[in-house]
Amino acid sequence: MNSKKLNIGPKDIINSLPEALIYHILSFLSTKEAAITSLLSRKWRYFFAFVPNLDFDDPVRMQPDMGNQEETEIHTSFMDFVDRVLALRGNSHVNKFSLKCGNGVDGVGVTRWILNTLELSVSELDLSIASDTTYLFPSKVFVSKSLVRLRIEARNGLAFGSLVIDVGDVSLPKLKTLYLDSVELDYQIICLAKLLSGCHVLEELVMIDVVWNFWESCSASIPTLKRLTFFTEEGWNNPPPSVTFDNPALVYFEYTDTVALKYEKVNFDSLVEARLGLRVGYEESENPIQVPFGFPFPLIEYAMVGDATDLLMGIRNVQVLYLYASTVEVLTFRCKAIPIFNNLTRLTIESNTKVGWDSLPNLLKNCPNLKTLVFQGLLHKATDRCGDMCPCKPPENIHTCLSSSPVKVLEILKFGEINDKTELEQTKHFLELMPHLEQLNIYYDTSVDDNLVKVSKQLQEIPGVASAKCKVQVISDNLTLSVTLPSSSSI
C-alpha cells in the first residue's frame, strides 16, 4: 500500500468533512466565533454565513468603559459584519436570528436586518435592543407567516429610551411563543388586544415589565395558551383597575404584580402549576391627614387596596403552588376568603421577616390532600394570629392547622441563613405537631460540617414527636446526616 495515501494531515481531515457535519459543528458557535473558522482553509471561507442560526452580539455592550471614538469604531465594524454576513447568505433560509446590541447601533440598520431575515422565512427572532432614543419596532414582523418564536427585549428597560411597538394588522399563524420585556405598547390595551388576537396557535406568553397598571382594563385571554408569565417590578404599586384571564388550556401560570382592584374573570380549567408574587396595592386615602398650621408640605395617607379573592378562586384546581412572601401578606389583608384547594399536593411558602404567617392556618386547613410542604426560610414576622403554625403564640385557644395536617413530606430550605436558634425551635415545633409526617429534609445553608452535627444532636433531644415514623435528614453542600428521632410520641 502506498504510504503517502496514509499521510493525511489535520488540514486534509478538516477539508474532507461533509458539509452537513461542518454546519452542525458551526451551529454550536456564535456567528462571530464561526467566522474565525474561515481562516482554516479556502473551503471553510464562507461556511459561517450559511449556518441555520445567526447570533450577533454587540461587543460594546460588554465594555461600558470604552472611549467614544473606540466605541464608534467598534459599532461601525459590528454593523459592517452583520451586513456582510446577510449579504453572503443571499436567499438562504434562516432558522433563528439572535441580535443583542447596545446604545450606538444605528436603529435604521437594526430594522434593515430584521426585515432581511423576515424575507428569509426566519422561524425564530430573539432581539435584545438598547437605545438612548425611541426605537419604533418594525410592524412587518407582526404579519410574518414563518415566525414560531418571537422575543423582544428593550435592554435599557423602561427608564431610558423606549422600544415602542405599534401594530397595524396582525397575522402570526405559526407563532407559538411570544416574549415581551420592557417594551412600550403604543395605544396600550388596544395594541395588546390586536397583537394577541392575531396569534391563533400561541402556547406561551411572557410579559416582563409591560406595565398595565394605568390601563382601564387588562386582558390576557387566549384559548390555545399553555404557559403564561407576567412580571412587573416592585416599584409599580398602582393596582390595575380590572384584570381578565380566560385561558382554559393553561397548565403553567406565573404572576408577579400588584393585586388588581377586581378580577373580572379567571378561567384556568387545566391549570397544574402556579407561582404567585402578588403585592398589596396602595392608593391615596380619601381622609387627608390633619397637619399643624405652617407645616411646609401636606401629608398623604395611603390605604391598602385590591382584592385577590377571585384570582385565588380561579386557580383553586392547581396541583403545585408557589407563594412568594408578598402573596402571603396579600392573603392576610386583601383576600376575603381562601378557597379549598382539593387538588393541591405540593405547596411552597417563601418567608420574610417583614411578613407574618397570619393567613397560613386557613390556607393549610383548606388543602385537604396536601402531601409536600416546602418552606423557603422559616423566619417571619411574629404576630398573635398565626394559630399553631409557630411557637410564638401561647398554646391555648389556637387553630390546630398543623395537628390536622395531612402533609407527609416537609422540606425546609435556607435553614441557618439568619438565625439558627429560632429556626431550630420552629423545626421542633413542626415535628411535635404534624402527625402524618414521614420525611423531613432540612437544607442547611452552611459550609461548616460541625453545624450539621450540632443541629442533628439537638433534634435528637426532642422529648417527643407527633409521627414516630418520620425520617429526618440534615443536608448541606458537603454533608448529609440522618437523624434518629425519639420513638415515643408526645400526642
Curated annotation (Swiss-Prot):
SUPFAM superfamilies: F-box domain, RNI-like. Keywords: Leucine-rich repeat, Repeat. The keyword Amino-acid biosynthesis does not apply. Pfam families: F-box, LRR_At5g56370. InterPro entries: F-box-like_dom_sf (IPR036047), F-box_AtFBL13-like (IPR053781), F-box_dom (IPR001810), FBD (IPR006566), FBL60-like (IPR055294), LRR_dom_sf (IPR032675), LRR_FXL15/At3g58940/PEG3-like (IPR055411). Residues 11-57 form the F-box domain. LRR repeats lie at residues 127-154, 156-182, 184-209, 325-351, 352-377, 419-444, 472-491. This is Putative F-box/LRR-repeat protein At3g59230. It comes from Arabidopsis thaliana (Mouse-ear cress).
